Curated annotation (Swiss-Prot):
Alphabetical GO biological process terms: regulation of fatty acid transport; regulation of transcription by RNA polymerase II
Record field: compositional bias (Basic residues): 305-315
Induction: Expression is increased in bone tissue of osteoporosis patients.
Modified residues (Phosphoserine): 27
GO molecular function, one term: sequence-specific DNA binding
Protein name: DNA-binding protein REPIN1
Organism for this UniProt entry: Homo sapiens (Human)
Keyword vocabulary terms for this entry: Acetylation, Cytoplasm, DNA-binding, Metal-binding, Nucleus, Phosphoprotein, Repeat, Zinc, Zinc-finger
Modified residues (Phosphothreonine): 30
Lineage: Eukaryota, Metazoa, Chordata, Craniata, Vertebrata
Length: 567
């Protein structure tokens, strides 16, 4: 009787169901009789509706399907021989030790009087399947996450969220954001905004279909111009702003401006774009490609607008050279096209005229007033009033960093950046918060901290409901759910979700240790390591055990030590 119960299928997926007690102890006829009995009880695995018709017999070990019991029996003999862990009681073999241990509890609990008894609480059951389900109740108490609505417990939070959506849906008052189109309600505002994009796309399709009407097949015939020719030349019109396009793909790409959709993502940094040309132009930053060369000087540019801005420098230089002839140079005769036109004298070279009496001192033709932009950048065409501003700007193109930190040797392109960096070593924090008194080394950090005192948190994560005061914090937090890691180390290829983690990781390759201990000569790459190290110098405030008097450097070691006294 016991051996026959061991051959029953184990419910709920705790162990694989079995059809044979040994590799070669039963014939196909015996197996067929046993299978018919199991089918009458409704416990056969082959009766599952999820299995393919015609191949209803499945192996309990490798999950393969077979058209008949004989083929399954022949396969099971070979499959069981490969399983490494046999049961000493009935000969059944298992692939994993936990399944064998659970199976042996069935033999230990089976008695002729009480049936199957639980070895934890002593409760007895008629069948071993009920015992296995009961053992699951004991293991459920070890699960750390409990449902707040019922007594069920889970190993992971995503299992709890799925359980809450399925068994405990939120009440209507807990979902205050209602869609005006379909009446669907949401708990978070961001979820409603994302849902409304579906209706926007549908409305655009319907409006475009009504405006255009049924279009004839084939290429339209060329007709004479008629009123409303723009509608003929640009038949595809946006239903939101009225802008018209010649081709439907252009309209589809334009509609993403209204819907907020950005389907084109950069594989290097994760930034998203509405159109593929924007992505192509952006990727040149990573590849270093510069396809637009200057015909005058040969300098290459990444984007065409930068080339056009740069070409103006050559035009201005040519114009100034033509407008400023030498003092003794002869006057060239004007060409046939230039003779009728009046020459345009340059303003700086034109002699100043005497102002009429009563004229204001700021006369437009006053030669003393120079143009505001005197110094232009040869790379991008930007102009500056002072030469030092131009030199500071040109460091962005050349990569020059003349300001070096005396503590760690790090270089900077601007002196203000060096001053802000030096506060890391000195510990100076001149910017203080008026609300809580907290101090910061940079003004931008203080400005970001002041928003923490604001009562509202408008940016809500649609996955877990966590709220943030700043949109970049929400974007960085959402990478936890999406698993996106856009920041890649160029030395080893390891990827990170936060840029600060990449900066901290790169110190492993560079050997940089910016955090130095003021009490000794040691330095550290992480600030947390410096804080832990400095506790070793603080002997007066060390963590002391009140029972034996032993001291420790940190509180965690003291708590671990005190557990020995509790035992």
């Amino acid at each position: 009787m016991l051996e026959r119960r061991c051959r029953g299928p184990l419910a709920m997926g705790l162990a694989q169901p079995r059809l044979l007690s040994g590799p070669s102890q039963e014939s196909p006829q015996t197996l067929g009789k046993e299978s018919r009995g199991l089918r009458q009880q409704g416990t056969s695995v082959a009766q599952s509706g999820a299995q393919a018709p015609g191949r209803a017999h499945r192996c309990a070990h490798c999950r393969r399907h077979f058209p008949g019991w004989v083929a399954l029996w022949l396969h099971t003999r070979r499959c069981q021989a490969r399983l490494p862990l046999p049961c000493p009681e009935c000969g059944r073999r298992f692939r994993h030790a936990p399944f064998l241990a659970l199976h042996r509890q069935v033999h230990a609990a089976a008695t002729p009087d009480l049936g199957f008894a639980c070895h934890l609480c002593g409760q007895s059951f008629r069948g071993w399947v009920a015992l296995v389900l009961h053992l699951r109740a004991h293991s459920a108490a070890k699960r750390p996450i409990a449902c707040p609505k019922c007594e069920r417990r889970f190993w992971r939070r995503k299992q709890l969220r799925a359980h809450l959506r399925r068994c405990h849906p939120p009440a209507p008052e807990a979902r205050p954001f209602i869609c005006g189109n379909c009446g669907r309600s949401f708990a978070q505002w961001d979820q409603l905004v994302a849902h409304k994009r579906v209706h926007v796309a549908e409305a655009l399709e319907e409006a475009a279909a009504k405006a255009l009407g049924p279009r004839p097949r084939g290429r339209p015939a060329v007709t004479a111009p008629r009123p409303g020719g723009d509608a003929v030349d640009r038949p595809f019109q946006c239903a939101c702003c009225g802008k018209r396009f010649r081709h439907k793909p252009n309209l589809i790409a334009h509609r993403r401006v209204h819907t907020g959709e950005r389907p084109h993502q950069c594989p290097e940094c994760g930034k998203r774009f509405t159109n593929k040309p924007y992505l192509t132009s952006h990727r040149r930053i990573h590849t270093g490609e510069k396809p637009y060369p200057c015909k005058e000087c040969g300098r290459r540019f990444r984007h065409k607008p930068n080339l056009l801005s740069h070409s103006k420098i050559h035009k201005r230089s040519e114009g100034s050279a033509q407008a400023a002839p030498g003092p003794g140079s002869p006057q060239l005769p004007a060409g046939p096209q230039e003779s009728a036109a009046e020459p345009t004298p340059a303003v700086p070279l034109k002699p100043a005229q005497e102002p009429p009496p009563g004229a204001p001192p700021e006369h437009p033709q006053d030669p003393i007033e120079a143009p505001p932009s005197l110094y232009s950048c040869d790379d991008c065409g930007r102009s500056f009033r002072l030469e030092r501003f131009l030199r500071a700007h040109q460091r962005q193109h050349t990569g020059e960093r003349p300001f070096t930190c005396a503590e760690c040797g790090k270089n900077f392109g601007k002196k203000t950046h060096l001053v802000a960096h030096s506060r890391v070593h000195s510990g100076e924090r001149p910017f203080a918060c008026e609300e809580c008194g907290r101090r910061f080394s940079q003004g931008s950090h203080l400005a970001a901290h002041r928003r923490d005192h604001a009562p509202d948190r408008p940016f809500v994560c649609p996955d877990c409901g966590k709220a943030f005061r700043h949109k970049p914090y929400l974007a960085a937090h959402r990478r936890i759910h999406t698993g996106e890691k856009p920041y890649v180390c160029p030395d080893c290829g390891k990827a990170f979700s936060q840029k600060s983690n990449l900066v901290s990781h790169r110190r492993i390759h560079t050997g940089e240790r910016p955090y130095a201990c003021p009490d000794c000569d040691r330095s550290f790459s992480q600030k947390s390591n410096l804080i832990t190290h400095r506790k070793s110098h603080i002997r007066d405030g060390a963590f002391c055990c009140a029972i034996c008097g032993q001291t420790f450097d940190d509180e965690e070691r003291l708590l671990a030590h005190q557990k020995k006294h509790d035992v």
